Amino acid sequence: MARSLKKGPFVDHHLQKKVDVQNKEGTKKPIKTWSRRSMITPDMVGHTFEVHNGRKHLTVFVTDNMVGHRLGEFSPTRTFKGHPIKK
């Protein structure tokens, strides 16, 4: 079920704080996060995030097309080895 529009997008406070500090300073260092549930907002465009997938952190560079999606969508948790070969 989709989130109500009147509530607005969910972003963890600690993650938003890090983005705001980098925007104020003008730096673009990678931000390491475990918050896969946070939604990508327009002020995150151009930043690089290291999103945890359960085993390691995968690098995600945020572009305009990613706004409105969640960080976890770009860091897959399962590896697909392919369908089994029929004998």
Swiss-Prot record:
Extract the InterPro entries matched here: Ribosomal_uS19 (IPR002222), Ribosomal_uS19_bac-type (IPR005732), Ribosomal_uS19_CS (IPR020934), Ribosomal_uS19_SF (IPR023575)
* Source organism superkingdom: Bacteria
A single Gene Ontology molecular function, please?
A: rRNA binding
Keywords carried by this UniProt record = Ribonucleoprotein, Ribosomal protein, RNA-binding, rRNA-binding
Which GO CC terms are listed, alphabetically?
Answer: cytoplasm; small ribosomal subunit
Q: Fetch the Gene3D superfamilies from UniProt.
A: 30s Ribosomal Protein S19, Chain A
Q: Which GO terms describe its biological process?
A: ribosomal small subunit assembly; translation
Annotated region described as Disordered, given as residue ranges? 1-29
Bias kind Basic and acidic residues: ranges: 9-28
Show the PROSITE patterns listed in the entry: RIBOSOMAL_S19
Q: Which residues cross the membrane?
A: none
Q: What functional role does this protein have?
A: Protein S19 forms a complex with S13 that binds strongly to the 16S ribosomal RNA.
The family line of this record is: Belongs to the universal ribosomal protein uS19 family.
Fetch the PANTHER family from UniProt.
Answer: RIBOSOMAL PROTEIN S19P FAMILY MEMBER (PTHR11880), SMALL RIBOSOMAL SUBUNIT PROTEIN US19M (PTHR11880:SF8)
* Protein name (database record): Small ribosomal subunit protein uS19
Q: Which organism is it from?
A: Protochlamydia amoebophila (strain UWE25)
> What broad taxonomic lineage does this protein's source fall under?
Bacteria, Pseudomonadati, Chlamydiota, Chlamydiia, Parachlamydiales
